[in-house]
Amino acid sequence: MKEFLEITKGLSDATRVRALLSLRGGELCLCQIIETLRLSPSTVSKHMDVLCRAGLVDRRKEGHWHFFRLACRNGAPAARRSLRWVLEALKDEPVLEADSRKLRGVRRKNLKAVTACYRRS
């Protein structure tokens, strides 16, 4: 029951679904997700924590940087089935298509330029 509730919580917010689906093309740094969604770092970070707890997303840390990817291979079977369902159900969603266009631009940028949110003053 707990796993089900975590997954449904992860999928119950439009911003989390947008963040989740931004990972369709592969691993992203938190700052790339922030730039794509155009939300504050703390907001995106909290959403990514929920997705990780749900088992929908894997996280790795490299220095101050946090990288995320879909938990396709390592996730629990229920999380993997949920991911497949979301990908299929929302494949033609206009907001997600707009996010994909933004993300293509973000991916073309130098990662150091995008990760400016990690630089300390």
Model-derived features: positions:
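Short, hydrophobic-biased segments on the C-terminal half of alpha helices
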Residues: M48-D49
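Beta-hairpin "wing" of winged helix-turn-helix
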Residues: R53-E62, R69-A71
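N-terminal helix-turn-helix DNA-binding core of bacterial DNA-binding proteins
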Residues: K2-T43, W65-G75
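A cross-family signal for key residues in well-ordered alpha-helices
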Residues: K9, R18-L21, C52, D58, ...
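C-terminal regulatory/oligomerization modules of transcriptional regulators
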Residues: G25, P41, R53, N74-S121
